[in-house]
């Protein structure tokens, strides 16, 4: 059996902390306003794999009302979500992530993001694609108020 899931996440800029995207610290003058580390790419991916396995979403598994997830490392959240997906008998077919940001530029960091994601979801780096786009200065991402991300995940029954 093959299953597909879609995830989406958005975070606004505004906190004095590192900007983490795809598990990688991206140099920038501000970080995200978020309960966890705010990693939009890993949050979207976590939702995609949970959705594909019919396990709900990141908010169900790791509610932002629970202080144990305050400033949580999103790589740990992704690994736990994937562990639950594996328990249902699935492995990754492939994942595809689109980061939507006017700034900062993602290209220099994409290979590192792919490597960390592949490590976390126990697959080959060739099964992980990360790309970035802008909104041509339109909307909140175009005004550099934050970043959005979409992800899809294909799961295969083991």
UniProtKB/Swiss-Prot annotation:
InterPro entries given in the database record: MECDP_synthase (IPR003526), MECDP_synthase_CS (IPR020555), MECDP_synthase_sf (IPR036571)
Catalytic activity: 4-CDP-2-C-methyl-D-erythritol 2-phosphate = 2-C-methyl-D-erythritol 2,4-cyclic diphosphate + CMP
HAMAP family the UniProt entry points to: IspF
Subunit and partners: Homotrimer.
Entry function: Involved in the biosynthesis of isopentenyl diphosphate (IPP) and dimethylallyl diphosphate (DMAPP), two major building blocks of isoprenoid compounds. Catalyzes the conversion of 4-diphosphocytidyl-2-C-methyl-D-erythritol 2-phosphate (CDP-ME2P) to 2-C-methyl-D-erythritol 2,4-cyclodiphosphate (ME-CPP) with a corresponding release of cytidine 5-monophosphate (CMP).
Keyword annotations from UniProtKB, A to Z: Isoprene biosynthesis, Lyase, Metal-binding
NCBIfam families: ispF
Functional pathway: Isoprenoid biosynthesis; isopentenyl diphosphate biosynthesis via DXP pathway; isopentenyl diphosphate from 1-deoxy-D-xylulose 5-phosphate: step 4/6
GO MF term list: 2-C-methyl-D-erythritol 2,4-cyclodiphosphate synthase activity; metal ion binding
Source lineage: Bacteria, Pseudomonadati, Pseudomonadota, Gammaproteobacteria, Pasteurellales
GO BP terms: isopentenyl diphosphate biosynthetic process, methylerythritol 4-phosphate pathway; terpenoid biosynthetic process
Binding sites annotated in the UniProt record for 4-CDP-2-C-methyl-D-erythritol 2-phosphate: 9-11, 35-36, 57-59, 62-66, 133-136, 140, 143
Cofactor: a divalent metal cation
Protein name in UniProt: 2-C-methyl-D-erythritol 2,4-cyclodiphosphate synthase
Annotated cofactor note: Binds 1 divalent metal cation per subunit.
Family listed: Belongs to the IspF family.
Residues annotated as binding a divalent metal cation: 9, 11, 43
Entry EC number(s): 4.6.1.12
Enzyme class: lyase
The keyword Lyase is annotated on this UniProt entry: yes
Top-level division of the source organism's lineage: Bacteria
UniProt key word Transmembrane helix: no
Species assigned in the record: Haemophilus influenzae (strain 86-028NP)
Database matches in Pfam families: YgbB
């Amino acid at each position: 059996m093959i299953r597909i899931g879609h995830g989406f996440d958005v975070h606004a800029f505004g906190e004095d902390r590192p900007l983490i995207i795809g598990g990688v610290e991206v140099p920038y003058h501000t970080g995200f306003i978020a309960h966890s580390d705010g990693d939009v790419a890993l949050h979207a991916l976590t939702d995609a794999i949970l959705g594909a396995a019919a396990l709900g979403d990141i908010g169900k598994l790791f509610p932002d009302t629970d202080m144990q997830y305050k400033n949580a490392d999103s790589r740990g959240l992704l690994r736990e979500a994937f562990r639950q997906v594996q328990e249902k008998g699935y492995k990754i077919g492939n994942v595809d992530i689109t980061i939507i940001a006017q700034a900062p530029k993602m290209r220099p960091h994409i290979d590192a993001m792919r490597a960390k994601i592949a490590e976390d979801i126990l697959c080959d780096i060739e099964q992980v694609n990360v790309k970035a786009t802008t909104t041509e200065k339109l909307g909140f991402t175009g005004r550099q108020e934050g970043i959005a991300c979409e992800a899809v995940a294909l799961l295969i029954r083991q």
